[in-house]
Amino acid sequence: MFYCRSGFEKECAGEIQDKATQLEVFGFPRLKNNTGYVLFECYQEGDADRLIREIKFNELIFARQMFAVAVEVSDLPKDDRISPILDALSEVEDVPCCGDIRIETPDTNEAKELLKFCRKFTVPMRQALRGKKMLTERDSNRIPVLHICFIAPGHCYVGYSYTNNNSQFFMGIPRLKFPADAPSRSTLKLEEAFHVFIPKEEWDDRLASGMWGVDLGACPGGWTYQLVKRSMFVHAIDNGMMAQSLMDTGQVKHHMVDGFKFEPPRKNVTWLICDMVEKPARVAHLMGEWLIKGWAKEALFNLKLPMKGRYDEVLQDIENLKDFLKKNGFQYKLQAKHLYHDREEITVHIQAISNISPH
């Protein structure tokens, strides 16, 4: 089972089908539009476990979470939902003992009604599973996570994921609060990207105070805000106006020029960030140009998606960018994700591994 943004089931299914085919795991996706999840039916027993081990979760773009389904339980009675779930699990072999439980729903308006129930249900369900030795006495992040996903009040899928190859977040969504002093809600996209792409233990080194960043298409400053908050200095590139609150910090230099023409005055930039409303192929190429010239060490940018053929467009743009970097002898780590705060766009992160002198 794979969670995704409602309305992007087709893209998620296409991606899973591609990954499964590469691994020679045969099956087919089952999906309904606007449900917020995709099921992949494997033809062979044990292949679901193979998929969640061998598909690298951090290489999936459209899936927020993945787990192997052990059982589907429907028609749960209102007065006792626990016993049928325990009975169904007891009949299945190969379900590992788990160290944590997440009782979730897909991220849709309809399913949100179920979340209150999920929260109340978690404590008694956890106790019952511990009583049956299906869950460890204490939470452990070293062994699998048990997922119970309710798609309707009496209907759930129960399964497990591996902690070294899943999303650490409940429902695959980081819970972030909008900062009251941020100039726009877009600030949450960049904050979420930091949580998803950069391990927390590396934040002090890679998001350090005193670094320089460049924000292409910065106005009014939602993304710049995240760098300023971390005590960085920022070249904000936009013909529009920046929020006065950011300018007052003394950490922002505003350049009223075209983002495609700007060149940093000093080549001491660590972070290049970009959320421009432009053709995705054009933005991807611009990011590649900056990186091969050594103008930035890390790039984080959004690619806007077309109305049709979204998955194909994403694949093409990322493939072209990889080819461009490879041809120029540039070594890198690349991740892309359709984040919770993204809508018709995906976010891409590239970290330079090559040590290139700026030129």
UniProtKB/Swiss-Prot annotation:
Concerning its family, UniProt says:
Belongs to the class I-like SAM-binding methyltransferase superfamily. RNA methyltransferase RlmE family. RlmM subfamily.
GN (gene name):
rlmM
Q: How does it assemble?
A: Monomer.
Query: Which residues does UniProt mark as catalytic?
Result: K304 (proton acceptor)
> Among its keywords, does the record have Transferase?
yes
Residues that, per the record, bind S-adenosyl-L-methionine:
S186, C219, P220, G221, G222, D238, D258, D275
Which keywords does this chain's UniProt record carry?
A: Cytoplasm, Methyltransferase, rRNA processing, S-adenosyl-L-methionine, Transferase
Top-level enzyme category: transferase
One Gene Ontology CC term in the entry: cytoplasm
Q: What is this protein called?
A: Ribosomal RNA large subunit methyltransferase M
Known role: Catalyzes the 2'-O-methylation at nucleotide C2498 in 23S rRNA.
One function term, GO molecular function aspect: S-adenosylmethionine-dependent methyltransferase activity
What are the subcellular locations of this protein? Cytoplasm
- Record field: catalytic activity: cytidine(2498) in 23S rRNA + S-adenosyl-L-methionine = 2'-O-methylcytidine(2498) in 23S rRNA + S-adenosyl-L-homocysteine + H(+)
Coarse class of the primary localization is: cytoplasm
